[in-house]
Amino acid sequence: MDKIAVYIHGKDGNVNEAEHYKPLFPQYDVKGFDYKAQTPWEAKKEFPSAIRSLCKEYESVTLIANSIGAYFALHSLAGQRIEKAFLISPIVDMEELIIQMMAQAGITEGELKKRKEIYTSCGKKLSWEYLCYVRKNPLAWNIPTEVLYGESDHMTSCETISA
């Protein structure tokens, strides 16, 4: 085959989820990318070389990415040889998500800046470094993309996806 569809999972997902997409892309080799990155700056180091290596033998590259995996892909793969992307409930505005999480936890920006890291009551870590990074590094994506947005998606609003 000369076509590959690379699947990038979301948080707590795994490379085996790529199997779900094989029937949807019958003319492609479908492979999952199992990454270690936990932050966008780690993804920016890890994703480009890994995707180039995975795709080097193929003429056509399609990306399928989910949730935070989609955000990491949007952040790190804009300059890669990808013909089309399919994003499933992607996080597309990390700053908005962090601010929303801070508001839900009753944490001010000043408090986060002072403490650097705060764990919310539901166990999620809020990080001043992460917030500053996403503000300084906005997404710049120029690859043709289709988005599948779930009506029960609580991470990204419909308005944000539509913008």
Residue ranges and their predicted role:
Residues 64-73:
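Gly/Ala-rich beta-loop-alpha elbow adjacent to hydrolase catalytic centers
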Residues 6-11, 64, 88, 148:
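Short hydrophobic segments within beta-strands
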Residues 17, 38-56:
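Alpha/beta-hydrolase active-site loop
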Residues 1-38:
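Short, surface-exposed "cap/lid" segments of acyl-processing enzymes
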Residues 82-163:
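The alpha/beta-hydrolase serine catalytic core
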Residues 76-80:
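Aromatic pocket-lining residues of Rossmann-like dinucleotide-binding sites
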Residues 54-59, 141:
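Glycine-rich phosphate-binding loop signature in dinucleotide/nucleotide-binding domains
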Residues 4, 60-62, 84:
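Structural motif
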